């Protein structure tokens, strides 16, 4: 007789109780009970678990139906319940435990697509039953309903082979990468309601292409119960959220983006999950997907639970999920959310609320190993798909190869650059000279990682103000400041990311419950001109390889004057692979026009203006050179043997090149 003990999160330490007397031994099963080996899954080495876990339409013993399979190691009994049995716990719908590691399975004939179902999971002691959505379901009910829905992964005719071949052959380090981050539920709406994936594709693809972005980044589109979580507190990791349609609708959107040479990145959350009763939390009545130690599992700051990244079956769940999005939906990359929460045992915890690792440090060794393995898998099997880390600390080696003891990400968000520069642009220009280092410090560590410069959704919500409203001054100065900031960002080494709405100067913060304020573009000329500015700036970036071909090489950037704090001016050169490709940036962070401003240049010759943020067509004051030509002289400046004299626009960026 089993020694029954009700299991829950332990205050200190992990749940270590073993199930059954015959540990590690699997009972013999008939062919119809288990057609697959679960060895890789149980070892944490399975990368396509979604192909056999969950609910799959199959034919067994000449009967068509659905094979249900789930993992619940401490459950004493599991029922499949749903529309087909009036949601009742009946013995004929009881799943069979096909090995002692907790794999349960059941074949039910004559079930059709669209039927709703759940797993009724009885705990080890048999005294409590929880009703769980299928962790591997491909479809879920629209919130607030919580059941899984039987659906097939239908065939889809992709037309993006050329794109995928190019992705596999060519990396992005020496290519332009300008990402448009968006939330599908609030980018645009139709009569106040969500648009379908197909409806979104009709307007999004053309807009992104016209605006000159190279990639879109979708905030999470797996199923999640709370709109206000924006998808970052998930339940259905394999369910495409039903808010906007079905699997093939999403595939159609991605296919169209690819056919228009636009890449697709996806925000992905392998760090933590929501505690909703129908989800992964305490799945079999005990800690299953989360850590057994409550201090380690509980994420107090977000009200969520942290994945147990050392548990083999959880690793298989997450590795397979990453490859699911890449293989089934042709996603070009995953932006891994909350990496700091994964790496640090003391993240968000006070002294005494956490325990050190076996070496006495605060690094989560299981998470470190998980991330290395994740990135190794994607590099080996992802056919050119990338990973991006949202990581806010100075942890070393985020983008260093795994073979060199790095974590193996392709890129890392530069949160330091973002925080420094945003705090600077909110300052009155009178005080900016005292904080000049906020604008030049990033180049001190720029080549320590492969960075993306992010202005993301997190910066324009929860009282942080919209990007335009962060700018100092009256309306004219705000829009001038926005143009200046965006052009400085475009000139700075690193790939780029901008959140939706920033490109036309939306004044209100982002609101996930309504669409962007598209109406202001037509109603107010300055918003139209701001949108035209971002379009011109994006295309200028695309057309000039010096802005992206050597982002991660020191020879791609050279300061002209990094230290002019008194006048709050930064000047630098961007250099392309072809050393003749040079652009000179002069960024003035004051509202004063600087006449007869001396700038060092790399060579003698005639210099012309190629971009000016103060142009009248963008809403500026018109302090432009036009067709004027500046002849360099042999008068030295700083480290340069030659110089020119220019007029620098107020709160503006002037970009020059040799004729």
UniProtKB/Swiss-Prot annotation:
Give the compositionally biased regions (Basic and acidic residues): 1-12
The positions flagged as active site in the entry are: 337, 390
Tell me the segments the record calls region Disordered.
1-25
Q: How does it assemble?
A: Monomer.
Query: Which NCBIfam families has this protein been placed in?
Result: branching_enzym (TIGR01515), PRK05402.1 (NF003811), PRK12313.1 (NF008967)
Source domain of life = Bacteria
Protein's name according to its UniProt entry:
1,4-alpha-glucan branching enzyme GlgB
Which keywords does this Swiss-Prot/TrEMBL entry list?
A: Carbohydrate metabolism, Glycogen biosynthesis, Glycogen metabolism, Glycosyltransferase, Transferase
Q: Sum up the protein's function in the record's words.
A: Catalyzes the formation of the alpha-1,6-glucosidic linkages in glycogen by scission of a 1,4-alpha-linked oligosaccharide from growing alpha-1,4-glucan chains and the subsequent attachment of the oligosaccharide to the alpha-1,6 position.
Query: Reaction catalysed?
Result: Transfers a segment of a (1->4)-alpha-D-glucan chain to a primary hydroxy group in a similar glucan chain
| GO cellular component labels | cytosol
Q: Which family does it belong to?
A: Belongs to the glycosyl hydrolase 13 family. GlgB subfamily.
Q: What is an example of a GO molecular function annotated in this UniProt entry? A: 1,4-alpha-glucan branching enzyme activity
Q: Which GO terms describe its biological process?
A: glycogen biosynthetic process
Instruction: Kindly tell me the pathway this chain contributes to.
Output: Glycan biosynthesis; glycogen biosynthesis
- HAMAP family given in the database record: GlgB
User: Per the UniProt record, which EC number(s) apply here?
Assistant: 2.4.1.18
């Amino acid at each position: 007789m089993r020694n029954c003990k009700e299991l829950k999160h332990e205050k200190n330490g992990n749940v270590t109780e073993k199930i059954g007397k015959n540990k590690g031994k699997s009972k013999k099963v008939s062919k119809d009970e288990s057609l697959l080996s679960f060895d890789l899954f149980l070892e944490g080495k399975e990368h396509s678990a979604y192909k056999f876990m969950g609910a799959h339409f199959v034919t067994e013993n000449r009967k068509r139906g659905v094979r249900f399979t789930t993992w619940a190691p401490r459950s004493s009994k599991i029922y499949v319940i749903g529309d087909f049995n009036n949601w009742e716990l009946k013995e004929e719908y009881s799943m069979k435990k096909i090995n002692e590691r907790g794999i349960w399975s059941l074949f039910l004939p004559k079930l059709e697509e669209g039927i709703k179902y759940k797993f009724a999971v009885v705990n080890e002691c048999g005294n409590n039953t929880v009703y769980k959505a299928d962790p591997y379901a491909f479809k879920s009910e629209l919130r607030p309903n919580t059941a899984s829905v039987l659906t097939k992964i239908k065939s889809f005719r992709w037309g993006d082979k050329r794109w995928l071949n190019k992705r596999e052959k060519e990396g992005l380090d020496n290519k332009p990468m300008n990402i448009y981050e968006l939330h599908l539920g609030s980018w645009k709406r139709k009569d106040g309601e969500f648009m379908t994936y197909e409806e979104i594709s009709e307007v999004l693809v053309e807009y992104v292409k016209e605006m000159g972005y190279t990639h879109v980044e979708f905030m999470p589109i797996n199923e999640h119960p709370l709109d206000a979580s924006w998808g970052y507190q998930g339940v259905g990791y394999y369910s495409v959220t039903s808010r906007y349609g079905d699997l093939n609708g999403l595939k159609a959107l991605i296919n169209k983006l690819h056919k228009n040479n636009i890449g697709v990145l996806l925000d992905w959350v392998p760090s933590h999950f929501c505690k909703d009763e129908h989800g992964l939390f305490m799945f079999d009545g005990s800690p299953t997907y989360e850590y057994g130690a409550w201090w380690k599992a509980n994420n107090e700051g977000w009200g969520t639970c942290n994945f147990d990244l050392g548990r083999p079956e959880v690793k298989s769940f997450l590795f397979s999920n990453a490859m699911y999005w890449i293989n089934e939906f042709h996603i070009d990359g995953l932006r891994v959310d909350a990496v700091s929460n994964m790496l640090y045992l003391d993240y968000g915890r006070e002294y005494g609320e956490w325990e050190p690792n076996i070496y006495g440090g605060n690094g989560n060794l299981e998470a470190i190993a998980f991330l290395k393995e994740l990135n190794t898998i994607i590099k080996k099997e992802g056919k050119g798909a990338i990973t991006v880390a949202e990581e806010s600390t100075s942890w070393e080696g985020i983008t260093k190869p795994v073979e060199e003891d790095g974590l193996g990400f392709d890129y890392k968000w530069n949160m330091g650059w973002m925080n420094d520069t945003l705090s600077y642009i909110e300052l009155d220009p009178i005080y900016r000279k005292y904080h000049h280092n906020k604008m030049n410090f990033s180049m001190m560590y720029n080549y320590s990682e492969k960075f993306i410069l992010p202005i993301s959704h997190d910066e324009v919500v929860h009282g942080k103000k919209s990007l335009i409203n962060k700018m100092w001054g009256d309306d004219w100065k705000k829009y001038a400041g926005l143009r200046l900031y965006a052009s400085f960002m475009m000139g700075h080494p690193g790939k780029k990311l901008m959140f939706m709405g920033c490109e036309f100067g939306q004044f209100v913060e982002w609101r996930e419950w309504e669409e962007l304020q598209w109406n202001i573009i037509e109603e107010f000329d300055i918003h139209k001109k701001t949108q035209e500015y971002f379009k011109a700036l994006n295309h200028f970036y695309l057309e000039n390889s010096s802005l992206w071909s050597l982002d991660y090489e020191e020879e791609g950037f050279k300061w002209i004057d990094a230290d002019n704090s008194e006048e709050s001016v930064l000047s630098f050169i961007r250099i392309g692979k072809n050393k003749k490709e040079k652009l000179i940036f002069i960024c003035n962070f004051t509202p004063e026009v600087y006449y007869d401003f001396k700038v060092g240049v790399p060579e003698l010759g005639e210099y012309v203006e190629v971009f000016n943020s103060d142009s009248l067509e963008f809403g500026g004051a018109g302090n432009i050179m036009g067709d004027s030509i500046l002849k360099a002289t042999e008068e030295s400046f700083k480290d340069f043997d030659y110089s020119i004299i220019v007029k620098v626009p107020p709160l503006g960026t002037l970009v020059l090149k040799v004729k």
